[in-house]
Amino acid sequence: MEMNKVLHQDLVQATRRILKLGPSELRVTDAGLICKNPNYSVCDAMLKTDTVYCVEYLLSYWESRTDHVPCFIFKNTGCAVSLCCFVRAPVKLVSPARHVGEFNVLKVNESLIVTLKDIEEIKPSAYGVLTKCVVRKSNSASVFNIELIAFGPENEGEYENLLRELYAKKAASTSLAVRNHVTVSSHSGSGPSLWRARMSAALTRTAGKRSPRTASPPPPPPRHPSCSPTMVAAGGAAAGPRPPPPPMAAGSWRLCRCEACMGRCGCASEGDADEEEEELLALAGEGKAAAAAAGQDIGGSARRPLEEHVSRRRGVSTHHRHPPSPPCTPSLERTGYRWAPSSWWRARSGPSRPQSGPWLPARFATLGPLVLALLLVLALLWRGHGQSSSPTRSAHRD
């Protein structure tokens, strides 16, 4: 791989990060010069004494990025040790007679070239070992010691035992983490059992709600205890309890016509009330026909309960439909056997009187006795006047 500015900048940043160097501890060569001559050092780092530096890791990183065999050169400048980093090792500095050990002594102006091959040779084990370097001050003046310390197992057997221990610890930590996660989930409410319980509760609530199309109509209100209307015959006696109304259709409400509940229990419908009135009027007509055949007239006492019952029935139904306005003139409605005033007029004019004729309205029945009395008085007056005038006529004749 050819050297470019991007690769140069990446190598410099990686060196500063791995060796943990400050801004003043690393001197960087210009990228243009490195691109023209890769044999120059990319950067020079000033190392501190008694500080551990990851040399092997940095060499591996440079090798993977440049596809070359990099080399680091430790050089004693008299007052400190500098580390020169090369992408390619200079030919004049690389000698076959050099030797790199775990403990190296550097005098003034002496150098130590270190590559990955040298570090692998001093490793006690080929696997699981990371080599680091430490610069120490020697007892002699201007002399430094470079120590390459291998951190890891001492041999291959120890490395294998170390791997077994590491794998066992990892498996134990994994199982413990899974157990703790399950315990925390069960306590916090995110476990599968609690989720299943919540889902079942939600389904139960959803099943309890029915759509408006499939929901059955609400039950009708209870029947009033005193709501048992009876049928009144022509003679004024009760003919027995009224037969029960037909069953209501689903979703429908009927209006009660009985006197006790005042339309609150829904025990009868409008059609049932009309049928009952027709039956009562038919019974009254039959009673009148029987009395006429026997040569008797139906009195007010025998006909009054029937008319009062019919008027009350009609008044209740009219009240529950809509409150009517008082009419200007009393309207007549056709009954089963004669013309009679409306229920509203009968309710305000009191109980009906015996009718004087087959087609005479009921409101004129009360005027009959008065008219007859007036006629009788006039007849008596006329007769008295006639008797008083008869002696005068006889005197004139004489």
From Swiss-Prot:
Domain of life: Viruses
Residue spans crossing the bilayer: 360-382
One GO CC annotation: host cell nuclear inner membrane
Ranges of the Nuclear topological domain: 383-398
Perinuclear space side, ranges: 1-359
Compositional bias segments (type: Low complexity): 225-240
InterPro entries hit by this protein: Herpesvirus_viron_egress-type (IPR007626)
Post-translational modifications reported in the UniProt record: Phosphorylated. Phosphorylation by viral kinase UL97 at Ser-216 plays an important role for correct viral nuclear egress complex (NEC) localization.
Membrane-topology descriptor: Single-pass membrane protein
Biological process annotations from GO: viral budding from nuclear membrane
Location relative to the cell: Host nucleus inner membrane
Alphabetical keyword list: Host membrane, Host nucleus, Late protein, Membrane, Phosphoprotein, Transmembrane, Transmembrane helix
Modified sites of kind Phosphoserine: 216
Pfam families: Herpes_U34
Main location: host cell
Region named Disordered: 202-246, 306-334
Biased composition (Pro residues): 215-224
Cited function: Plays an essential role in virion nuclear egress, the first step of virion release from infected cell. Within the host nucleus, NEC1 interacts with the newly formed capsid through the vertexes and directs it to the inner nuclear membrane by associating with NEC2. Induces the budding of the capsid at the inner nuclear membrane as well as its envelopment into the perinuclear space.
Family per record: Belongs to the herpesviridae NEC2 protein family.
Subunit architecture: Forms a heterohexameric complex with NEC1. Interacts with host UBA7 and RNF170; this interaction promotes UBA7 proteasomal degradation.
Protein name: Nuclear egress protein 2
Gene coding for it: NEC2
